[in-house]
Amino acid sequence: MADAWEEIRRLAADFQRAQFAESTQRLSERNCIEIVNKLISQKQLEVVHTLDGKEYITPAQISKEMRDELHVRGGRVNIVDLQQVINVDLTHIESRVSDIIKSEKHVQMVLGQLIDENYLDQLSEEVNDKLQESGQVTVSELCKAYDLPGDFLTQALTQRLGRIINGHLDLDNRGVIFTEAFVARHKARIRGLFSAITRPTPVNSLVSKYGFQEQLLYSVLEDLVSTGRLRGTVVGGRQDKAVFVPDIYSRTQSTWVDSFFRQNGYLEFDALSRLGIPDAVNYIKKRYKNTQLLFLKATCVGQGLVDQVEASVEEAISSGTWVDISPLLPSSLSVEDAAMLLQQVMRPFGKLASAIVFSDTVVVSEKFITDCTGLFSERMHQKAEKEMKNNPVHLITEEDLKQISILESVNTSKKDKKDERRKKATEGSGSVRGGGGGNAREYKIKKTKKKGRKDEDSDDESQSSHGGKKKPDITFMFQDEIEDCLRKHIQDAPEEFISELAEYLIKPLNKMYLEVVRSVFMSSTSASGTGRKRTIKDLQEEVSNLYNNIRLFEKGMKYFADDTQTALTKHLLKTVCTDITNLMFNFLASDFLMAVEEPAAITSDIRKKILSKLTEETKVALTKLHNSLNEKSIEDFLSCLDSATEACDIMVKKGDKKRERQILFQHRQALCEQLKVTEDPALILHLTAVLLFQLSTHSMLHAPGRCVPQIIAFLHSKIPEDQHTLLVKYQGLVVKQLVSQNKKTGQGEDPSSDELDKEQHDVTNATRKELQELSLSIKDLVLKSRKSSVTEE
């Protein structure tokens, strides 16, 4: 109730004051705004709108409020925060900041912040507290803690060192502040640690292991080394690879190097590197600058070792022997260094040194090499004479003949090849195998290949067929053979040296062998030329005989079926036709001194080699003749033979009836004489069948053994039944004997087949006995009929 009366009395008093108050004039808010804007536009009033537009504030008031806010915030305030507090546009704040900085020297602008000296003093006090606590502080850590730039902070702290901050700045690294106690403590640790080191130690490893400040460590270490407190050197400067080398280690190191060099006469760069010497070459040059040394790739050699090698080389050259310098050198020297050393030793000899280096370390005198070639002299003559007899076609090539002085007169006259060949043929040509060729044999020459054969020693005959130039196909010995011979005469020689020496000797030995072959060939040619050569008349007679034989053999083949004719044709081409071809090739080979004693020894490869030396006109005809031997037609062969004889100026006498009868008689006589003396059942059957064929058909037949059954089958209607039955029975026994022999060969020495062997033996004996009983009867089929028959001549 009392409160209500109190409120009534207060309202009555306010009413009374209002009755007695004087009335005044008031401007509206709009009029006030217009008046202020007019004053601002006339520059009679300088005020700034607040951001909400409700107040005006003067620049002086802005500056005052900024100073107040800076003081309130401890001397550091961001201008963005000032703009929010004062509530004016940021441009007005920035314009007043520049005025404050100009008027007040203790205030500065850093990264959009106002900072005064009071704040920096306070910051320095905090830094000093941290410094005294830890002994060191880094500017980088302070930058992160106080969000200030490093240069500004370094400058501010430097000004307060000794005044507020009790410490000093590292001169080498201005980003660290130390206390004297910290430096002294670390200096003592560094001094103690490095005093205990006795071998080269990387400084960087100590920094990480013991937690040293890197720049402080290098500064203290250099100071201790320069003052002599630490005995040693820092190699590598202030880098990650810096190494502290104590003097005691350097002295021990130098003592070891001197001792090793004095005892061994050389130094290994790797060994010095393992001792902790990074640049071994420069170390050696500095330490032994007055000593004569030879620097190799991985070692350094003293003059004593060089003189020892030089003396051994000189002795080997003067005595005509060889020397391997490897045993004279330390085992640790590489082959490359040994080769470089030997090269330096050989240099003073210059062109006067008649020696060759093998395997990088073996010095061989020219006299020793000459002696080695002399080891093969006798073998050269033996091989040349042997090869000369066997196959001279492989020994002398066309290029070799150009170098033989005795043939120069022949090479100068090349006007007419046919005339020249005819002239030589009248003097004589190579002898050939005589006879009618009825049972000519086949010859095969097997080629062997040596494992040590070199490319330059091989003769690819395909090159000659393509007309390409090639090296002489003359090889004395292959490398492995030469090595075997050298091992017998050179004792205790390294295998590599033997191999290289053999390879080196191949060419000179082949060259010497070529000269020996020429000498043997020419002497053999001159000594036996008269006996070896045959006249053109003898050749024409022999070619004519073989030609007529082929014609008669072809006539006899026509009695058989086509498949049998094919087999007979192949056999005839392989034997008699090949013989007549070889006769002609051997005759042409005499132009090149390539004729052989026995034309039957000429193979297809030798014919190709002879073809490569013929003139184009002769070569075409002889090539067709050579190729026709691989065909299946006797007519084609005879056609090619006619062309070949015409190209070679060989006249062939074609046979007439009388001549054919003579050939038939002579052929039968030769077969009968062979039948009389032979005891081989298979050959008896073969000869009897061929003779019965000739007696019944009056035609010659040249047949292989596999065609005998067909001949016997043909004779079934040509001879009496009893004779044919006897012939068939004898054929069965021959086949049985051959089968038995093949079984015995295939079984070998199998113990489980003893019983079978016994039975087989009994059967074989019975067969052989029966064949012996019938052989005479089989021979009589021909020999008795020959006595009773009419003479064919």
From Swiss-Prot:
Modified residues annotated as Phosphoserine in this record: S458, S462, S752, S753
Expression tissues: Ubiquitously expressed with higher expression in pancreatic islets and other secretory tissues. In the embryonic brain at 17 dpc, detected in Sox2-positive neural stem cells and in Slc1a3/GLAST-positive radial glia. In perinatal brain, highly expressed in Slc1a3-positive Bergmann glia of the cerebellum. Continues to be expressed in Bergmann glia of adult brain at 16 weeks. Expressed in adult heart. Highly expressed in the intestinal exocrine cells.
Positions of region (Disordered): 410-473, 742-765
Gene Ontology biological process: DNA damage checkpoint signaling; DNA damage response; DNA repair; erythrocyte differentiation; hematopoietic stem cell differentiation; negative regulation of IRE1-mediated unfolded protein response; negative regulation of NF-kappaB transcription factor activity; negative regulation of protein ubiquitination
Key words, A-Z: Acetylation, Chromosome, Cytoplasm, DNA damage, DNA repair, Endoplasmic reticulum, Membrane, Methylation, Nucleus, Phosphoprotein, Transferase, Ubl conjugation, Ubl conjugation pathway
Region of interest (Mediates interaction with CDK5RAP3), ranges: 490-683
Enzyme Commission number(s) from the entry: 2.3.2.-
Annotated region described as Mediates interaction with TRIP4, given as residue ranges: 200-400
PTM sites of type Omega-N-methylarginine: R433
Sites bearing Phosphothreonine, chain numbering: T535
Record GO terms (molecular function): protein kinase binding; UFM1 ligase activity
Disruption phenotype: Embryonic lethality caused by impaired erythroid development. Conditional deletion in adult mice results in severe anemia and cytopenia. Cells show elevated endoplasmic reticulum stress and unfolded protein response in bone marrow cells and impaired autophagic degradation. Conditional knockout in cardiomyocytes causes age-dependent cardiomyopathy and heart failure, characterized by elevated cardiac fetal gene expression, increased fibrosis, and impaired cardiac contractility.
Database matches in InterPro entries: Ufl1, Ufl1-like_C, Ufl1_dom, Ufl1_N
Modified positions (N-acetylalanine) in chain numbering: A2
Segments for region (Involved in CDK5RAP3-binding): 121-250
Inducing or repressing factors: Up-regulated in hypertrophic hearts (at protein level).
Chain positions covered by the region annotation Required for E3 UFM1-protein ligase activity: 2-212
Family the entry assigns: Belongs to the UFL1 family.
Protein's name in the database: E3 UFM1-protein ligase 1
Native organism: Mus musculus (Mouse)
Gene encoding the protein: Ufl1
